[in-house]
Amino acid sequence: MHARWIEFPSACDIRTLSERIGFFKLWGNGVPMQQTPQRGVSLRAVGIGLLCCTALSLGESYGVLVVRGSAMAADYSTGAALVLFFLLILVLNPLARLLTGSRLDSRELATVYIMMIVAAAIPSWGFVMNLIPFLGGLFYYATPENDWAHSIHPHVADWLVVRDRTAIWKLFEGAARGEPVPWSLWLKPLRAWFFFIISIYFSTLCVLVMLRKQWMENERLLFPLATLPLELGRQEPDAWLPPLLRNYLTWIGFAVPFIMYGINGLHSYFNFFPFIQLNAYVRFLRDSIGLNLRPRFEVIGLSYLLSLDVSLGVWFFAFLSILHSGVERLLGWSIGPGQPYSMPATPSVAHMAQGAMFFLVFASIWSARRHLIAVVRSAVGRGRPIDDSGEILSYRTAVFGFLAASVFAVVWLSQTGLGYGSALFYYMLCIVTFIGLARIVSQAGLAYGVSPVAPPVFTVTALGPDVLGPSGLTALGMNFPWSADLRTFVMASTATGLKIAEVTRLESRRLFVAIALAILVTLISSTWIIMTLSYAYGGINLGGWGFGGLTQLTGNWIAHNILNPEGVYGWHLVYTGMGSALMAALTYLKTRFVGFPIHPIGLALGYTYPISQIWFSVFIAWLLKAVILKYGGAKGYRLLRPFFLGMVLGAFGAAGLWLAIDAWGGNANWFTL
């Protein structure tokens, strides 16, 4: 089962070829592989990591906007990072060993992967692809009919956007062939946004430093998303490939989605190839309830790693949310209109889930209270010093860095139009949301999900449009790019990365530098490519929804709240409280009765778009794993795990391959979420 997959010639025979291949000098140092020390966060690992981060940001932006193909960096699954990491281990690392006698060791590979998953949270749905259209979109889509010129434009801070109509028109409709991007017009708002988002990233990393030991050492959260990269990064002295890639079950699992997606991809070019229909949608109760029954292979593979109670909780509460929302529609009853980013759930379902997330964060902070108090006391020099040598930042830096970054962020938000109190409420709500989603990703390993109610939307719900005023409502809308469509963000990806760093024993302080460089390089490279593509093709001609639906949805939301203020949404807050109470009861049952079969963490996910797309795949994985454990036991689970990990690689590998083919062939195949 674990036989050598392939045997290569000896590296010593052709090592001199490496001198002719400059790229592989990053690997080679003339030292035989057996004598190369474990480097960890080495200069060559960081250099290769930055190259991969740049390739990831350029490839994701071009693939989504121009090719209109599969999004590979839109969720915590970080498909782009996995594909690049897979190629690095399958092709580039063995080739480097062949040519130079040296290869990246497991710790260096971990460094590269951590940098990539952090970078994957930035270029598309994470931030930049959402931000660029906002720099001029509220002006481009203003019409006499929507009257944004009078209701919104006077309240937009000048330093947040570009008001030059020619520059905006060229961003959305394209410039003349060969005309360069007028960076002097765009640098002012871009600089303001970059300073702000870096402060947000830094503050969340500081929070993560303060919580890491509690989550990893005290509570021992599982971090299932770290499993596949750790398996890929395992090395044996005499083996060219890791054990996972020498297991035939891995390649059988790989072949299932790879062949099926390959046939569908060929069908898009050659009609004589059959099309395998994977989509299935069932409606009942007068079309008030709809079930999306499409299996997604990458979700099935990743969900196999979840514990049965967690996967049961995810699909069970999703199914209950479907029924709840459907019955409300059937009866024609609702506590209010649908809200951005919460649909297809009704507002009552969304706010119950949001209340559950609030309790999840409260319970997490409460269980960590002694550790957090000790961290703060140690940071201010009033308590017993705590060993923080394993953290990417010292506790003193984390505590005071969080405070400084928070002050900067709140002041920045207040300058956009929010009052100081509203800015503080909104900022803390975002931090709570980040902690909640990072906890879900770390504990449950679920790679897909967003906040049940977006922080800007909940701020309006809790404070009311009258308190916020037109300037505050406009400011909240302008902050949609980083705080509304939270399909991925840096904190959760870094949490997975820190687990990988703990297992591989990376040098923590040097890792922080690598992460910071990855963030900076990705921000710059993704901004450059998206601006360049927008001027070359015209934003409205590109894929994604940033230049179209996102900007228009946000403008309509701002205008509606300004022109039709409804006060504090009382029933929404009541359902939020009900969700917190239900989560508390389920948490008590789970802790009081060890055999309680459903994990309440699924309640905090609600029924947002990602959950509506993956719940059935989670159900399939839960059913398969339950049957395997029942009849094969733990041995059967371990035996078949490579099959499911291979399925993840095959799904993302096929998506990446067809993205490259479509970039040349002109068609658009979308295989990811």
Positions of the model-derived regions?
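Short hydrophobic alpha-helical segments enriched in small aliphatic residues
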Residues: 3, 11-13, 19
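Aromatic (phenylalanine/tyrosine) cluster motif
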Residues: 8, 23-24
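Membrane-embedded transmembrane-helix bundle of lipid-linked glycan/lipid transferases
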Residues: 33-35, 45, 344-347, 516-520, ...
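Transmembrane-helix bundle segments that line or gate the permeation/cavity pathway
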Residues: 47-403, 408-480, 487-488, 526-547, ...
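Helix-loop-helix junctions within the multi-pass membrane cores of secondary transporters/permeases
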Residues: 224-237, 492-504, 508-510, 515-526, ...
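A glycine-rich phosphate-binding loop feature that marks nucleotide/adenosyl-phosphate handling sites
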Residues: 428-429, 515-522, 645-648
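Catalytic alpha/beta core of large soluble enzyme barrels
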Residues: 556, 561-644, 657, 663-664, ...
